[in-house]
């Protein structure tokens, strides 16, 4: 039934209050290609203004909040915590079931100087099998300008049985930009085995502004994760054990102390920000990066426990 609704939506043009919306292009018998765009800049009055919010079915974007910020920050000053910036909040809505096999979906994000963009989703994404060519794919490409901030934390991606899904996240940060990025993966729906899912995370940061001539961006994080029933020993004690949910939380920028995770009195997070050693506890670990930030990785038997471990971080014990 979901596939029938999918065909109806993608076969025509969805009408909006101001005229037709963009329609996703077909790439195969059932596969679709779609690219949505979010661009936020600082308005003359100091607020965060969405200068482009372009949906592309099945990716629907809705602005759900805005705040003026506690102060107006010069774009070159990194001392201001990111949550004090003028903020725009956008939610992602899946207009159809899926993604299905062969779907190629993407989201382009651009954050200007002196503003913050918060991106959330209204529900989990369930990757499903289908008749399209190759795996389904969702790509997020983001650029954050000096003094800008991106808080990207959608709901989990669920790899349903028989699915083959690829997640790609590519972020480019200016020297004084700030990033909070959370990714959560759930292996299968309730009572079923997992599908195959691969996650690639690349985060680069510009060299210091005083370097002349400018050098190539510095890699801040490279992370590849491959999961699925074809992986030998996936549920063994050396890998996931009984865990069915896993994820990571990356915080990077000139003032990570002002991040929401640090304000929760997470002792390991504060240690990481001050250059202390990594911290580890049951199902969760914190790794200081060779740049301004840290990475929390966790696994759990369910999505609720996973979220708590990512947000709170490990216990104060260090290794």
Curated annotation (Swiss-Prot):
InterPro entries, sorted: UreD
GO cellular component term, pick one: cytoplasm
Principal location: cytoplasm
Record protein name field: Urease accessory protein UreD
Keyword tags: Chaperone, Cytoplasm, Nickel insertion
Native organism: Frankia casuarinae (strain DSM 45818 / CECT 9043 / HFP020203 / CcI3)
Molecular-function GO term, any one: nickel cation binding
Role according to the record: Required for maturation of urease via the functional incorporation of the urease nickel metallocenter.
Sequence segments annotated as region (Disordered): 254-273
Gene from which the chain derives: ureD
């Amino acid at each position: 039934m979901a596939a029938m609704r999918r065909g109806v939506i993608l076969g025509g043009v969805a009408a909006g209050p101001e005229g037709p919306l963009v329609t996703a292009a077909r790439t195969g018998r059932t596969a679709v290609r779609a690219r949505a765009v979010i661009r936020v800049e600082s308005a003359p009055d100091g607020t965060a203004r969405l200068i482009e919010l372009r949906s592309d079915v099945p990716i629907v974007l809705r602005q759900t909040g805005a705040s003026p910020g506690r102060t107006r920050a010069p774009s070159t000053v990194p001392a201001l915590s990111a949550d004090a910036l003028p903020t725009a909040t956008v939610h992602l809505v899946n207009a159809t079931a899926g993604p299905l096999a062969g779907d190629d979906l993407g989201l382009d994000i651009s954050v200007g100087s002196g503003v913050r963009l918060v991106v959330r989703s209204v529900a989990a994404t369930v990757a499903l099998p289908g008749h399209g060519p190759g795996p389904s794919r969702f790509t997020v490409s983001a650029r954050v300008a000096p003094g800008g901030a991106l808080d990207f934390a959608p709901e989990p991606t669920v790899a349903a049985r028989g699915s083959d899904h690829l997640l790609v996240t590519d972020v480019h940060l200016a020297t004084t930009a700030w990033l909070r990025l959370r990714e959560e993966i759930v292996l299968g729906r309730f009572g079923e085995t997992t599908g195959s899912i691969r996650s690639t995370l690349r985060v680069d940061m510009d060299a210091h502004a005083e370097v002349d001539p400018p050098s190539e961006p510095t890699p801040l994080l490279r992370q590849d994760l491959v999961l699925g029933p074809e992986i030998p020993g996936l549920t063994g004690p050396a890998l996931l054990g009984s865990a069915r949910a896993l994820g990571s939380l990356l915080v990077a920028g000139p003032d990570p102390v002002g991040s929401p995770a640090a304000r929760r009195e997470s002792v390991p997070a504060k240690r990481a920000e001050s250059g202390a050693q990594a911290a580890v506890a049951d199902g969760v670990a914190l790794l200081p990066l060779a740049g301004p930030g840290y990475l929390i990785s966790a696994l759990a038997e369910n999505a609720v426990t996973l979220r708590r471990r990512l947000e709170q971080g490990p216990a104060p014990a260090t290794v």
